[in-house]
Regions:
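Acidic, glycine/proline-rich low-complexity segments that act as flexible tails and inter-domain linkers
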Residues: 2, 8, 21, 37-39, ...
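Glycine-rich phosphate/diphosphate-binding loop of Rossmann-like nucleotide-binding domains
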Residues: 7-46
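Short glycine/serine/threonine-rich phosphate/pyrophosphate-binding segments
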Residues: 19-23, 48-51, 70-79, 98-101, ...
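N-terminal beta-loop-helix "entrance" segment that forms/cooperates
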Residues: 39-60
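Glycine-rich phosphate-binding loop
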Residues: 54-92, 96
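Short, glycine-/small-residue-rich phosphate/pyrophosphate-handling segment
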Residues: 96-146
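Glycine-rich phosphate/pyrophosphate-binding loop and the adjoining helix
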Residues: 137-181
């Protein structure tokens, strides 16, 4: 969790503490942008009352975005979304039996009128969940928006550098191929 005295703006909930190593990139992404956050373990199936109370009280505590990670019968994001008006991002956690397909389908197959934004299963998903929360917050935070713009420029520069390095490698290998700009 962010080590600041500032109240958290993002809440991260997971179905089990064993999910944390698989989703810790969400916290790293939030920390990268200086967004304070909190994390909790709660289960849609084992502690439904705790999930309901957490989701219902989140906005009153100053949270602006909720991120819910679960594997298997991954109903945590849905349970959270049912009890809040805040944006909810679901992270489908990979599972040993089906590689996370079960988690993905449970997270994305929401009924109408109960929206949950979902990210990918695997390594990119948790980071994207954190970045998506940052983008949501940036809609009302000009300083955070500027950080995001700088981040996007940095990504563009990295790709341009990779393209240039590829062109140089192709020329050095005597290849007739080129990597287009």
């Amino acid at each position: 969790m962010s080590k600041t005295a500032v109240p958290p703006r993002v809440g991260v909930v997971m179905g089990s503490d064993s999910d944390w190593p698989k989703i810790c990139a969400v916290g790293a992404a939030l920390d990268e942008f200086g967004v304070p956050w909190e994390a909790r373990v709660m289960s849609a199936h084992r502690t439904p009352d705790a999930v309901r109370e957490y989701a219902r009280g989140a906005a009153d505590r100053g949270l602006k975005v909720l991120i819910a990670a679960a594997g298997g019968a991954a109903h945590l994001a849905a349970a959270v979304a049912a009890h809040t008006t805040l944006p909810v991002v679901g992270i489908p956690v990979p599972t040993p039996d089906l590689g996370g397909l079960d988690s993905l389908l449970s997270t994305v197959q929401m009924p109408g009128d109960v929206p949950v934004a979902s990210v990918a299963v695997g390594m990119g998903g948790p980071r994207n969940a954190g970045l998506f929360a940052v983008q949501i917050l940036a809609t009302s935070d000009p300083a955070l928006e500027q950080q995001l713009r700088a981040f996007k420029r940095q990504l563009q520069d990295q790709v341009a550098g990779s393209n240039q390095a590829l062109n140089e490698a192709l020329r050095g290998a005597g290849s007739g191929g080129t990597a287009q700009q």
